[in-house]
Amino acid sequence: MRKTDRHPVSGANSLWHVYQTVPFLKVVKNFIVIQIARYTPFIGMKNWLYRTFLRMKVGKQTSFALMVMPDIMFPEKISVGTNTIIGYNTTILAHEYLIHEYRIGKVLIGDEVMIGANTTILPGVKIGDGAVVSAGTLVHKDVPDGAFVGGNPMRIIYTKEEMQERLKKSAE
């Protein structure tokens, strides 16, 4: 189950009320910073931009590939551990606007996690240390430490123990 805070709205849908939930100038600033970071090939610069201007928590030696799209409204709710790779064109959401409510949730990505290209991570999930997320996955629930997951809907392909056994066999 994803951990999100629910905020009901009345009248028009929640996205119609967007600037009552997040300041307009914050969105403009975040948009500009994210667009610069999406296209720059300099990983150190991306991490600096994310930490400095978006207030994201980004661990040492973490790499964001080209075109990664962190949440534009609430990037400060995203935390990425050390020595993690976020694959090309991955989207990390910390919010979702629905018809009668909007939801906000932290996204916690552990240490030494590998996230494949074109993955979408929904708000309120935790991806455990050492996990591997296959390309094109919709991460809609927590991922256990060391697990290999993939698909839409996401499912566990190998547990941490099964992954260790596979690595052991391939080394023989």
Curated annotation (Swiss-Prot):
Its EC number is 2.3.1.-. Pfam families: Hexapep (PF00132). CDD domains: LbH_MAT_like (cd04647). Keywords: Acyltransferase, Repeat, Transferase. The keyword Transit peptide does not apply. GO terms for molecular function: acyltransferase activity. The keyword Transferase applies. It is an enzyme of class 2 (transferase). Gene3D superfamilies: Hexapeptide repeat proteins (2.160.10.10). Belongs to the transferase hexapeptide repeat family. This is Putative acetyltransferase YvoF. It comes from Bacillus subtilis (strain 168).
